[in-house]
Amino acid sequence: MPGEGERGGRGTGKEAILDAARQEFGERGYAAVSIRHIARRAGVSLSAMYHYYTGKQDLLHALVNGSGQAYFDSCRAESEQAGDDPGEQLAAVVRATVRYRAEYRLESNLTLTEWRSLSEEQLEEFRRRQFDGTRMFKEIIEAGVDQGIFRTPHPEDARRGVIAMCNAVAQWYRESGEESVDDLAERYVELALVLVEYRPAARRPRPSAASPAPRPDVRSPP
């Protein structure tokens, strides 16, 4: 997967503008960036810029929306391979989240920190997606608690803790570090399973069909 520096190269037209906005917002912060900064970095005129986007808020929305969709696609791809076990499902979405936050730090930080700059209509869409993300973790943890393999007495706190620590990776992870993304993801899987108090041996047996009552002995006494 290409690093962030490689994604900074100019494309053509709409792609170049979006890429320039990603870099400008990431380096300066959304509030400090003007539409002229983005056009200059993309190597296009303002008229070309407005042909594709109405302004920098529209660009932010495109970046946040695209990042959110890519993140959910990665979580879905991982979870579909995890089977029905809540422990494996939680490991899958934690792994996908950490990898995405580490490999796409610019996009992740924009999504996690600049969403307040969206319009009211755009915020509604963002909050729906945010709710879907929360529900994904919530349903997995609730299933594990119901089955008796997640023993935490505080599933909501565990969910918030897991999501927060995974999202925070985008703020501090650097590719030049000694630890690979895969190693980091596996360590966070271990931490997440500790938070939910994963006990696979404690799975509650599913109720089986009732055994038929024994037939009465109708033989005559000797």
Which residues does each PLM region occupy?
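Hydrophobic alpha-helical connector segments
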Residues: 62, 76-106, 159-162, 201-212
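Amphipathic alpha-helical segments used for helix-helix packing
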Residues: 102-121, 138
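Amphipathic alpha-helical packing segments from all-alpha helical-bundle domains
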Residues: 69-76, 121-147, 156-160
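Hydrophobic/aromatic residues within well-ordered alpha-helical segments
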Residues: 56, 63, 67, 71, ...
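C-terminal peripheral helix-coil segments that are non-catalytic and often amphipathic
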Residues: 1-2, 96-99, 103, 134-143, ...
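Helix-turn-helix
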Residues: 16, 20, 24-58, 62
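Short, hydrophobic secondary-structure boundary micro-motifs
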Residues: 109-112, 152-153, 203-205
